[in-house]
Amino acid sequence: MSAICVIKGDGVDGIINFKQNDNKSPVIISGVISGLKEGKHGFHVHEFGDTTNGCLSAGAHFNPFKKEHGSPNDENRHVGDLGNIESNKDKKSIINITDNIITLFGQNSIIGRSIVVHDKEDDLGRGNSQDSKITGNAGSRLGCGIIALSKI
């Protein structure tokens, strides 16, 4: 199964592709986002595929199992916690992620939800504030898009 997400924001745009062979396989995430300042930026699946009020209407991180925010490698993490992407000096982020928690199949599918890229680096739940365990202190939402089915 394949999905696509077109990221739009103020000066930020990109295309993210998702591929999963079956419901037991990892999801391969690939793409490019342009327009982000150099450095790391939080990158998450959010609960709603709603962009009527920009990225704010995308809701919180997708978290159907009610866990704390964490790193993509943590057992205790939101399903939507994909960590950080890194933008180079040319304001381009090349994305190549393999994730074993998100899925394109079944009740907890990410299809119809959204991807949000944030202003700051995600602290992966290791910060000293309560927000660290909820949002990773990743800051404002710079760009987002709805994850939709695509041709294989």
Swiss-Prot record:
It catalyses: 2 superoxide + 2 H(+) = H2O2 + O2. Keywords: Antioxidant, Copper, Disulfide bond, Metal-binding, Oxidoreductase, Zinc. Zn(2+) binds at residues 61, 69, 78, 81. Binds 1 copper ion per subunit. One of its GO terms (biological process) is removal of superoxide radicals. It comes from the Eukaryota. Coiled coil: none annotated. It is an enzyme of class 1 (oxidoreductase). InterPro entries: SOD-like_Cu/Zn_dom_sf, SOD_Cu/Zn_/chaperone, SOD_Cu/Zn_BS, SOD_Cu_Zn_dom. Disulfide bonds join 55-144. One of its GO terms (cellular component) is cytosol. The keyword Oxidoreductase applies. The keyword Phosphoprotein does not apply. It holds the Pfam family Sod_Cu. GO terms for molecular function: copper ion binding; superoxide dismutase activity. Destroys radicals which are normally produced within the cells and which are toxic to biological systems. This is Superoxide dismutase [Cu-Zn] 5. The gene is sodE.
